[in-house]
Amino acid sequence: MKNPLLRPWLTEKSTGLTEQKGQYVFQVKKDADKSDIKKAVEEKFNVDVVSIRTINCLGKTKRQYTRKGLIAGKKSDWKKAIVTLGEGQAIDYYAQPADKSDKQD
C-alpha cells in the first residue's frame, strides 16, 4: 500500500487523548490494516509505535427536501486509527511539510 495515512484527525477529543495519553488519531484509507499504518507512522514521523486501534466509521445518511421531493444520499464510510507512541515521544503535526505526492488518490 502506498501511504495509508490521509490526514490527522484534530478534534477536541483527539487533542485530549494526545495531551493525556500520548495517543494520536489519524484518518486512514478503508483498506489499510494495522501493520501498514504502523509502518507509515514510523517512517513519516520517526517514532516508535506501541499499539494501534482502528475504528470503521459509517457515513451519515443525508436527506434534503426539494420541490421534486425527497433526495436521499449518504456520506462515504471512513476509517480512523488511534496510534499510541512510546514513552516520551511526540508528533508535531504542523512541523511536517505537506507531501504533494500523497494526495494523488
Curated annotation (Swiss-Prot):
Belongs to the universal ribosomal protein uL23 family. GO terms for biological process: translation. GO terms for cellular component: ribonucleoprotein complex; ribosome. This is Large ribosomal subunit protein uL23. The gene is rplW. GO terms for molecular function: rRNA binding; structural constituent of ribosome. It comes from the Bacteria. Keywords: Ribonucleoprotein, Ribosomal protein, RNA-binding, rRNA-binding. Part of the 50S ribosomal subunit. Contacts protein L29, and trigger factor when it is bound to the ribosome. One of the early assembly proteins it binds 23S rRNA. One of the proteins that surrounds the polypeptide exit tunnel on the outside of the ribosome. Forms the main docking site for trigger factor binding to the ribosome. InterPro entries: Nucleotide-bd_a/b_plait_sf (IPR012677), Ribosomal_uL23-like (IPR013025), Ribosomal_uL23/eL15/eS24_sf (IPR012678).
